[in-house]
Swiss-Prot record:
GO terms for cellular component: viral envelope. This is Matrix protein. Disulfide bonds join C251-C295. Belongs to the morbillivirus/respirovirus/rubulavirus M protein family. Keywords: Disulfide bond, Viral envelope protein, Viral matrix protein, Virion. It comes from Human parainfluenza 1 virus (strain C39).
Amino acid sequence: MAETYRFPRFSHEENGTVEPLPLKTGPDKKAIPHIRIVKVGDPPKHGVRYLDVLLLGFFETPKQGPLSGSISDLTESTSYSICGSGSLPIGIAKYYGTDQELLKACIDLKITVRRTVRSGEMIVYMVDSIHAPLLPWSGRLRQGMIYNANKVALAPQCLPVDKDIRFRVVFVNGTSLGTITIAKVPKTLADLALPNSISVNLLVTLKAGVSTEQKGILPVLDDDGEKKLNFMVHLGIIRRKVGKIYSVEYCKNKIEKMKLIFSLGLVGGISFHVHATGTLSKTLMSQLAWKKAVCYPLMDVNPHMNLVIWAASVEITSVDAVFQPAIPKEFRYYPNVVAKSIGKIRKI
């Protein structure tokens, strides 16, 4: 059984809420485009910003009309039917313009999509019609991008492989950053196991403004009977000298000295940000790659939950530090359902 420590409410109440995207339709019954920007850290209030941008929209295929063979077939615009919803993360860039200029440039993009497979299912994006506001992102947009299908598409199985598919941008999520980079805990360090150490994990509890049960995300009832969602992230490990005894008070004291501040961003959909404003041990600092501000995109932590709540209002209701013995190095991690070198199963 793990020991826990609940962080005070002030650690997440200032920037622990994300407002929902307004899902409104116009006279043509199409969703009205909207841009949503949140701030993480201490970005400049005016002028140049570092923006991480995520495009949200719909996958569409041309409607099959009657083959009349008339000249009007060449002049009439093609109508499309929606076959799914998804996103396109385009990353961080230095941006000089306004929010509305960015929105206009994003919805004017012509994006074609292809569903394919490597070790897992992938979505390929090819982009054209890149206007001036998007020039800071043009390098990666022109090259085309490939993403894990389960991270960027709500139902990749609904995307046909025998039809042309376009991605129509409707919403733009932007995260205005106080620094040029988003620091993530390297996987090798997150998987680090040391003897005589305690793993410090964070249990983040959220309140989402959308019903999630029908989409496969079951909420948990809190003490007041309210439906909440939660996920866990790994912060690091605390290590003591051989022979020293760990106590809950010792671990709590270590955590309190860090003076952690939590916030929500829109990196990859919904993202959880941790900023250490206090003192960190050298062991923990090295695990965080010597950064005091760390980002955990829900797209990486829990992709399906991210797909379900990325357009909704989201609020942090509590954050708990969970102290657990570090998993011994002798334990083998099996990333695949089929374990290699067992019986007649061999890795090719």
